[in-house]
């Protein structure tokens, strides 16, 4: 931040007076601020009457509210409960469900194994599950019992039946019960027949196999069929003639009997063990394994949680005749099935819970399932008595006793009457069981009308009677069936009918017709059942529920009428004695308060009118007039002074250009011309001297070595012949092996980059090549074909280290180790890796020393691609040692051509020295620039930020400063110790003249020492190379101090930095030097461009642009994809070509991009080095690094190559990809609007450029004369008597960084002028103002 100080002469009385005037102004400002302060007047009128009235009002309201408190509370807890009851009662009909389920077990049996249907039995169950009637009766009694007390109507209504309603709500769950009518078809013996069929099939197959193996087939055909064949025949005839017609007739009769006799319920129950005994008697005992598997499976299917043999939702919920009071909850989804389950709670359980009896001591009832089902409907009495238990136990035991006694009828059984005996026993057992069950349930139903005891007795009597009757009827039916089995030919026809596939196909039609008839019968039956249910179940329940609802609603209607009557009596008294007195008192108090407020406001408004009038007349108007007058006077004086200053500045500007600016410009132009001439002379001297060196080298070094190599080749020609013969023999052996194994070498895919290379050896592979492929063994040739190195971009299995040492360097991950390995690899190859090429050039380009172990044979030598100038003696010694060792080893081990060795060890190093020589000029310019930048102020930055920018701002405002500023400036210039001309001569002319004189000896010393050193040691090649390198190194070190050019160049540029305006392009010394050095570099680098290869071109461009060596692989990839390595390639088909701006050259750059980023002195787009240098500049400015180029980044990710992101002009609507690689791009609209100009300015700043508007006049830039005029301090001189002078002096310590600093300076100058003029007007004194 610039520092501006003001030094006043303490002995100057005028300055002291100015200070006093300044203090006076400050006091005036304070007084003005005091006058401008706001004046607040607070008027408070205290009305004691108002306060007292308010207290009286508060007291009346407080005391009156406490003295009389009347509350009317109506607490109605009944209405909501009754509404809930009413809603639930309305839902009762909607939730009634009628379910009809037909479970046909017969059809499933037919589909699986087509079993016999001889003893197929079907049972139908009609179950009306009425749980509502008893609940409704119980609710009616409960309501009648608990509503006798009614409602008590008071001023505060108290609901005495809240708990009663809550209990009623809990009881409403009974209304949610569901009615079910289930029709179940059960199959009882399908599994038994299935098991027997498998057994019979096994026996039949065994018999047939025995018959087929018998030789006497005719004799076997005459034999009678076995027992199994007879059974098949008997069963077939019996089924056709007797069984099936009897089953159809019996089913029809049973269905009619069920409908006529048992409308409410009929349960058929046959024990599985009874049927097991019957079928075992008929078909014989079964194996435990077979019966266990099938019977268990069938039982699991029939006895699941679905409720026995029924598949309807009710059975799934647990309401089935086979379950006893299972508790399932309605509307709660089970984990498996049963979405509609119903909670069933018997009446005994409810009564036990209400009475508080524990479950352990509660009486248990036993009996038939029908009795338990009807037990839920009973609402009065208890169902436990000793007599009932006795009868029920007896009735339950009778069927089983009858079943046991029936076994004694098996006495006298023989072959002829076995069917009759077994049939009578089975019929007796089944009939007794079924009759006992049905009779017990029917008797219990009839007895329930008498009471609980009647229910138990009726169930017992019904069970006994039903068992006897059923046993008698079952015995007769079984006897007839068994006799029919014995007398008919059923046994003979079983094998031919029941186990015959054709027989089954004929019978199936009859079975399906019968099943359809059964379904029709079920539909007719259900029609009658539903009519009966509506008549005898739903209508009675509905008729009972409606009066209950009406009764409850009527009770609450009477209660509400009572509440209304009481309120009609209370309301008149409340209005007369409470409401009217309170409202009147409140109205009077409010009227009094408002009247007092109105009177107070009238008094306040009158007082304020008087105060405001006085304030305006005595305070505001005098202050405002005084301030206005003072401001007008001050402004008029400032304008007068400003007019005088502006008239004087015109003369100042003319003097400044004539005496400061123009002399400096002329002197700098002369210096520029002189420097250019010296650089041209030096370049011409180098070119002329090199021609002599080349001639001498060919005469004294190249030609003798060629002759020596030819002689050596002649001496060792026999080795070549031996190698050819041995190699031919080895080749024949390998060829013979290929004929046997049929294995041949796969062709090696050469890198596309190598195809484009010239036949001229490259810098990096000269020392790695063999003298001739023909001089190598077969194994060495194979190794040489594989050991080519390369760049790995994806996972690969590779053969490494097969021909020597190799480095594997990671570049994406573990970059620290990669850099370390890269440095080691460069050291082994005689190269150096640097991150900053500028730092490398400043250090003289000292290379890494060549280790002795790096090249132990002439086949693996190393060389640097850059000319090493700091350690040539050591390198020359190493090269000589390698030559001697390699020469001896080549003679003793294998033949080596002298021509190849000469190219590798002599021609190539000196060629590299030629290509590296352009760096010398660059290093000199770089050191010169570094010397300038190393000054205390910094020439470029100092002149740009401290001189150019502030003076431009000063020029635009200098017309207002006045004559005093101009005269003080001129006097300060003239009073310096050195003066402008002397300063320029000392700090500009003499340093450059010294540089001119010194530069003449650089080339002569270099070439002279070089030639002398070569001539003195021409007799010995090894010593000559050493001395030559040493002379070259010494010349450069002594004359240029090239190992540290910054030291020499710093001394040259230190004194020339101050006063030289480097910011101007016309006199920019650094740019001029770079341009001259660049042209010199271009001249040298262009020597081998056409004859080189891609790698050499890119290496030269990398060195010219000071780019890291790590960019080489990426640049080679871009060159290969963009041009194929062809520097003359041009693209004539893309959008750039259509716009007249085709991409061309090695890196395929468009001319506009090339011109924007080309290196100094490299302006030929077809020159591959120039093209690559421009491409490198573009990559640096656009992407920052080679790794961020879209094509390189895409290839590293395993994707395709992507071309440049070049930007361009958009002339039509399109969809484009911008910002590739997350790099910034600017999109600027072409219209001349605020947005477009703003974006253009921002883009120029990002590119390090400036944007100017030609429509606006631009002030001319200041020359270096302005700089020298202000960089020297001066002392103020005494003013001439009778004159008035104001000195404003500047020196190099005054730094202006931005416009704000300049504006601050101008403001301070104007203030000083105003103060001085004001003082002169007031007191008439004369003084000097010194401002630094």
Curated annotation (Swiss-Prot):
Where is composition skewed (Polar residues) in this entry?
A: 355-368
| Gene3D superfamilies from the UniProt entry | 1.10.530.10
Query: Where are stretches of biased composition, namely Basic residues?
Result: 324-335
Q: Which domain of life is it from?
A: Bacteria
> Which InterPro entries does this entry report, sorted A to Z?
Lysozyme-like_dom_sf, Transglycosylase_SLT_dom_1
Family of this protein: To B.subtilis YqbO.
User: What protein name is recorded for this chain?
Assistant: Phage-like element PBSX protein XkdO
Record's compositionally biased regions (Basic and acidic residues): 202-222
Species annotation? Bacillus subtilis (strain 168)
Disulphide bonds in the chain? none
Q: Which residues form the signal peptide?
A: none
Q: Which gene encodes it?
A: xkdO
* Region entry Disordered, spans: 202-225, 324-368, 744-771
- Name the Pfam families on file: SLT
């Amino acid at each position: 931040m610039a520092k501006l100080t003001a030094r006043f002469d303490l002995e100057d009385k005028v300055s002291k007076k100015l200070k006093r005037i300044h203090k006076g102004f400050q006091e005036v400002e304070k007084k003005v601020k005091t006058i401008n302060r706001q004046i607040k007047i607070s008027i408070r009128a205290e009305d004691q009457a108002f306060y007292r009235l308010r207290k009286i009002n508060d007291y009346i309201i407080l005391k009156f509210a406490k003295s009389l408190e009347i509350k009317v509370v109506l607490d109605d807890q009944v209405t909501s409960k009754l509404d809930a009851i009413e809603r639930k009662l309305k839902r009762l009909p909607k939730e009634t469900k009628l379910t009809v389920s037909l479970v046909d077990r017969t059809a499933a049996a037919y589909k699986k194994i087509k079993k016999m249907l001889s003893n197929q039995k079907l049972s139908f169950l009609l179950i009306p599950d009425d749980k509502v009637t008893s609940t409704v009766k119980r609710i009616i009694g409960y309501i009648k019992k608990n509503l006798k007390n009614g409602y008590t109507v008071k001023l505060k209504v108290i609901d005495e039946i809240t708990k009663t309603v809550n209990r009623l709500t809990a009881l409403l769950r009974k209304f949610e019960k569901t009615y079910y009518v289930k029709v179940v078809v059960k199959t009882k013996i399908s599994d038994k027949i299935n098991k027997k069929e498998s057994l019979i099939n096994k026996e039949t197959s065994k018999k047939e196999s025995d018959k087929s193996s018998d030789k006497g087939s005719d004799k076997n055909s005459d034999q009678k069929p076995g027992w199994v064949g007879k059974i098949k025949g008997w069963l077939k005839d019996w089924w056709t003639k007797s069984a099936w017609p009897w089953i159809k007739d019996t089913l029809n009769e049973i269905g009619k009997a069920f409908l006529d006799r048992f409308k409410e319920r009929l349960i058929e129950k046959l024990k599985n063990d009874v049927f097991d005994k019957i079928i075992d008697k008929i078909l014989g005992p079964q194996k435990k394994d077979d019966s266990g598997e099938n019977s268990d499976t069938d039982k699991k299917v029939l006895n699941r949680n679905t409720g026995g043999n029924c598949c309807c939702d009710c059975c799934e919920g647990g309401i089935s005749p086979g379950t006893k009071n299972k508790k399932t909850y309605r509307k709660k989804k089970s984990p498996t099935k049963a979405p509609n389950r119903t909670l069933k709670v018997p009446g005994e359980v409810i009564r036990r819970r209400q009475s508080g009896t524990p479950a352990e001591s509660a009486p248990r009832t036993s009996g038939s399932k029908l009795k338990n089902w009807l037990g839920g409907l009973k609402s009065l009495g208890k169902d436990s008595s000793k007599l009932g238990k006795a009868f029920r136990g007896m009735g339950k035991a009778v069927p089983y006793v009858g079943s046991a006694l029936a076994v004694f009828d098996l006495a006298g059984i023989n072959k002829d009457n076995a069917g009759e005996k077994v049939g009578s026993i089975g019929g007796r057992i089944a009939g007794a069981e079924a009759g006992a069950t049905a009779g017990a349930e029917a008797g219990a139903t009839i007895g329930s009308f008498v009471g609980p005891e009647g229910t138990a007795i009726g169930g017992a009597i019904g069970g006994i009677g039903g068992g006897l009757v059923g046993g008698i009827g079952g015995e007769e039916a079984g006897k007839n069936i068994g006799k029919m089995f014995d007398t008919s030919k059923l046994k003979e026809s079983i094998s031919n009918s029941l186990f015959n596939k054709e027989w089954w196909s004929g019978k199936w039609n009859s079975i399906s017709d019968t099943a359809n008839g059964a379904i029709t019968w079920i539909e007719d039956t259900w029609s009658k059942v539903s009519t009966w249910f509506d008549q005898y179940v739903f209508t009675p329940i509905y008729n009972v529920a409606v009066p209950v609802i009406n009764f409850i609603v009527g009770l609450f209607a009477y209660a509400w009428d009572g509440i209304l009557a009481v309120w009609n009596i209370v309301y008149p008294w409340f209005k007369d004695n409470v409401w009217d007195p309170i409202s009147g008192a409140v109205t009077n108090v409010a009227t009094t308060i408002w009247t007092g407020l109105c009177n107070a406001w009238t008094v306040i408004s009158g007082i304020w009118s008087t105060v405001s009038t006085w304030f305006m007349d005595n305070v505001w108007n005098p202050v405002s007039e005084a301030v206005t007058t003072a401001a007008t006077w001050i402004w008029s004086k400032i304008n007068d002074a400003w007019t005088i200053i502006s008239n004087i500045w015109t003369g100042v500007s003319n003097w400044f250009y004539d005496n400061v600016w123009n002399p400096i410009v002329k002197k700098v132009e002369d210096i520029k011309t002189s420097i250019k001439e010296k650089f041209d002379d030096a370049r011409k001297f180098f070119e002329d001297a090199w021609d002599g060196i080349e001639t001498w080298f060919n005469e004294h070094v190249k030609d003798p070595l060629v002759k020596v190599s030819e002689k050596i080749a002649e001496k060792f020609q026999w080795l070549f012949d031996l190698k050819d013969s041995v190699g031919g023999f080895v080749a024949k052996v390998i060829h013979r092996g290929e004929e046997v194994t049929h294995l041949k070498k796969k062709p090696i895919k050469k890198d596309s980059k190598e195809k484009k290379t010239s036949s001229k050896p490259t810098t990096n592979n000269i020392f790695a090549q063999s003298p001739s492929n023909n001089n190598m063994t077969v194994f060495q040739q194979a190794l040489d074909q594989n050991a080519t190195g390369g760049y790995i971009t994806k996972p690969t299995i590779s053969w490494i280290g097969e021909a020597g040492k190799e480095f594997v360097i990671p570049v994406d991950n573990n970059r620290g180790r990669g850099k370390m390995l890269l440095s080691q690899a460069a050291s082994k190859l005689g190269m150096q890796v640097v991150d900053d090429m500028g730092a490398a050039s400043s250090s003289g380009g000292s290379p890494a020393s060549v280790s002795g172990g790096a090249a132990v044979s002439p086949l693996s030598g190393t060389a640097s691609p850059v000319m090493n100038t700091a350690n040539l003696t050591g390198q020359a010694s190493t090269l000589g040692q390698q030559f001697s060792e390699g020469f001896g080893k080549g003679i003793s081990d294998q033949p080596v051509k002298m021509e190849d060795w000469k190219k590798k060890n002599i021609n190539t190093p000196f060629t590299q020295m030629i290509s590296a020589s352009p760096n010398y000029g660059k290093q000199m310019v770089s050191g010169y620039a570094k010397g300038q930048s190393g000054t205390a102020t910094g020439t470029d930055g100092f002149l740009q930020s401290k001189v150019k920018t502030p003076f431009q701002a000063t020029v635009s405002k200098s017309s207002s400063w006045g004559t005093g500023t101009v005269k003080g400036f001129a006097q300060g210039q003239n009073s310096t110790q050195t003066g402008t001309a002397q300063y320029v001569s000392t700090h500009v002319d003499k340093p450059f003249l010294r540089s001119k004189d010194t530069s003449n000896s650089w080339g002569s010393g270099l070439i002279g020492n070089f030639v002398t050193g070569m001539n003195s040691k021409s007799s010995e090649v090894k010593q000559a190379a050493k001395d030559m390198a040493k002379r070259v190194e010494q010349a450069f070190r002594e004359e240029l101090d090239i190992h540290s050019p910054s030291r020499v160049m710093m001394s040259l540029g230190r004194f020339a930095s101050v006063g030289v305006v480097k910011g101007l392009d016309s006199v920019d010394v650094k740019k001029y030097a770079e341009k001259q050095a660049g042209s010199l570099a271009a001249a040298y680098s262009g020597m081998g461009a056409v004859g080189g290869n891609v790698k050499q071109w890119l290496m030269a461009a990398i060195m010219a642009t000071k780019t890291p060596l790590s960019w080489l692989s990426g640049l080679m990839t871009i060159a290969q994809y963009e041009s194929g390595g062809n520097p003359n390639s041009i693209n004539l088909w893309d959008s750039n070509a259509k716009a007249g701006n085709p991409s061309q050259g090695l890196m395929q750059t468009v001319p506009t991009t090339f011109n924007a980023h080309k290196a100094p002195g490299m302006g030929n787009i077809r020159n591959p080095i120039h093209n690559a240098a421009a491409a490198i500049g573009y990559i640096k400015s656009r992407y920052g690094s080679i790794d961020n180029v879209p094509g390189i980044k895409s290839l590293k990710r395993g994707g395709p190559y992507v071309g440049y992101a070049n930007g361009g002009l958009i002339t039509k609507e399109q969809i484009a990809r911008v910002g590739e690689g997350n790099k910034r791009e600017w999109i600027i609209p072409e219209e001349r609007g605020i947005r477009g100009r703003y974006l253009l300015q921002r883009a120029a700043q990002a590119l390090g450029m400036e944007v100017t508007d030609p429509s606006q006049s631009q002030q001319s830039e200041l020359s270096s004369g302005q700089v020298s005029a202000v960089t020297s301090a001066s002392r103020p001189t005494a003013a001439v008597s009778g004159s008035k002078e104001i000195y404003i002096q500047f020196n190099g310590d005054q730094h202006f960084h931005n416009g704000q600093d300049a504006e601050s300076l101008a403001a301070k100058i104007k203030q000083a002028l105003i103060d001085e003029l004001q003082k002169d007007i007031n007191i008439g004194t004369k003084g000097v103002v010194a401002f630094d």
